[in-house]
């Protein structure tokens, strides 16, 4: 027997990843897991038996850094018990904080920004390091091809990263860098690979996803709408979604894709942030309320059944009650299916950081008023689905025997009694009941 044959197989190394924040972080965590898989790591859901713990952070929400340091504090006993445990911090807080993370928390071995995670395996082999550079090379070119394993029926696919808009409240241009669009060929290859592994729904991701542009196979310039049409041509793919968008990049070809492409779901998340022209200017949003409302009219004319969702920030520096009333008026005018609303929180390094904040109690009251209006609209939208027949893609079994849970065309969670169904089935469901955050129905005859 040769020495090679007699060597024991290397011990399996276990990787635990905690993902904070947006869908792109979910995608990034998956790609980092695949990169570390090439190093012999397998994912574990048990943090205590991991050989590496990776915290993939988000910097959008309030007190993101404090939440990270709190989680790291809870890892101190585990690191003391197992000094060989590698602890890494990835994502946008890693980009923003850099070496400060290791200074405050020496238990952290690795700090890697979102544009450098293709170098995570080399950093792990080195044992310790910080990499928050914006490399010239495309990180996707250096990541291993995903393993040919069966996938869940819905998947994310990053097509664009970074943002050039520089909204006054936002850290994304500083943590994710300038806008970069992935090449058409790479996107289509990854989409085909996902479909070959059982994916029926793809959500295209980007910080400013509808700003994507690239060169098509014939050498012409493509916009995001043309990319969607090309992805829709993939046999076996049934649904396409995308997030997150900027109103200024809702080009004619993208609106036309909503009109013409049946695989593009009738759902659009289009953040507006405020219903006051004065505040929109202070935020550097580069559009007016009227421009947003006219855009909504064009979108609804192209796709009358579309559900619109949005984001709002209340209590932005300088916001008056009149500005707040303008936001309420915009919400009433559009009638959103759902929306996310937050009280402004300052982000170091952003233009709005040094501006005087309004009184906290005033901002809290405005947020409550806005959320009450948005909740009433969401309730009406949910109730309006009762009696309708919707497409539902089953993603997992429900808690009850014979029950399946899936997503509707409009991204609702839908509960259905379907004992013979399986994950990945795309079925028609007649909606019979609505709840604040879900629907229930029966299989259509």
Curated annotation (Swiss-Prot):
GO MF: 4 iron, 4 sulfur cluster binding; metal ion binding; N6-isopentenyladenosine methylthiotransferase activity
Residue span(s) of domain Radical SAM core: 149-383
Domain of life: Bacteria
SUPFAM superfamilies documented for this protein: Radical SAM enzymes (SSF102114)
Main location: cytoplasm
CC cofactor note: Binds 2 [4Fe-4S] clusters. One cluster is coordinated with 3 cysteines and an exchangeable S-adenosyl-L-methionine.
Keywords: 4Fe-4S, Cytoplasm, Iron, Iron-sulfur, Metal-binding, S-adenosyl-L-methionine, Transferase, tRNA processing
CDD domains in alphabetical order: Radical_SAM
Binding residues for [4Fe-4S] cluster 2: 163, 167, 170
Domain TRAM per the UniProt entry, residue ranges: 383-445
Catalytic activity: N(6)-dimethylallyladenosine(37) in tRNA + (sulfur carrier)-SH + AH2 + 2 S-adenosyl-L-methionine = 2-methylsulfanyl-N(6)-dimethylallyladenosine(37) in tRNA + (sulfur carrier)-H + 5'-deoxyadenosine + L-methionine + A + S-adenosyl-L-homocysteine + 2 H(+)
Descriptive protein name: tRNA-2-methylthio-N(6)-dimethylallyladenosine synthase
Organism expressing this protein natively: Paracoccus denitrificans (strain Pd 1222)
Lineage, highest ranks first: Bacteria, Pseudomonadati, Pseudomonadota, Alphaproteobacteria, Rhodobacterales
């Amino acid at each position: 027997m040769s020495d090679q044959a007699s060597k024991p197989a290397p011990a399996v190394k276990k990787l635990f990843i905690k993902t904070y924040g947006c869908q792109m972080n979910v995608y990034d965590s998956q790609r980092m897991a695949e990169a570390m898989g090439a190093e012999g790591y397998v994912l574990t859901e048990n943090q205590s038996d991991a050989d590496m713990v990776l915290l993939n952070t988000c910097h959008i929400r309030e007190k993101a850094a404090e939440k990270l340091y709190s989680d790291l504090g809870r890892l101190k006993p585990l690191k003391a018990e197992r000094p060989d445990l590698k602890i890494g911090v990835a994502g946008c807080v890693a980009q923003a904080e850099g070496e400060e993370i290791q200074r405050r928390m020496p238990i952290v071995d690795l700090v890697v920004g979102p544009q450098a995670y293709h170098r995570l395996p080399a950093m792990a082999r080195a044992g310790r390091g910080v990499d928050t550079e914006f490399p010239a090379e495309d990180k996707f070119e250096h990541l291993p091809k995903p393993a040919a394993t069966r996938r869940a029926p819905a998947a994310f696919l990053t097509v664009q990263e970074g943002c050039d808009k520089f909204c006054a409240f936002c850290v994304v241009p500083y943590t994710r860098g300038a806008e970069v669009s992935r090449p058409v060929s790479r996107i289509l290859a990854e989409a085909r690979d996902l479909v070959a592994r059982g994916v029926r729904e793809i959500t295209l991701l980007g910080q400013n996803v509808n700003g994507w542009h690239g060169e098509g196979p014939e050498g012409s310039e493509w916009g995001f709408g043309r990319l969607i049409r090309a992805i829709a041509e993939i046999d076996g793919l049934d649904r396409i979604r995308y997030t997150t968008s900027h109103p200024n990049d809702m080009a004619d070809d993208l609106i036309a894709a909503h009109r013409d492409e049946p695989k593009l779901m009738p759902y659009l998340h289009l953040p507006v942030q405020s219903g006051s022209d004065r505040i929109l200017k202070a935020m550097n949003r580069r559009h007016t309320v009227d421009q947003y409302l006219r855009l909504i009219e064009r979108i609804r004319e192209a796709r009358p059944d579309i559900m619109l969702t949005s984001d709002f920030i209340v209590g932005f520096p300088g916001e008056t009650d009149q500005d707040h009333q303008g936001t309420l008026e915009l919400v009433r005018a559009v009638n959103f299916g759902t929306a996310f609303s937050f009280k402004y929180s300052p982000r170091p390094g952003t233009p709005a950081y040094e501006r005087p904040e309004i009184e906290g109690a005033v901002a809290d009251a405005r947020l409550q008023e806005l959320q009450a209006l948005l909740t009433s609209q969401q309730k009406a939208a949910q109730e309006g689905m009762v009696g309708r027949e919707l497409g539902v893609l089953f993603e997992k079994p429900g808690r009850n025997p014979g029950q399946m849970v899936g997503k509707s065309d409009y991204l609702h969670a839908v509960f259905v009694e379907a004992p013979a169904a399986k994950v990945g089935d795309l079925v028609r469901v007649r909606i019979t009941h609505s709840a604040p955050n879900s629907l229930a129905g029966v299989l259509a005859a």
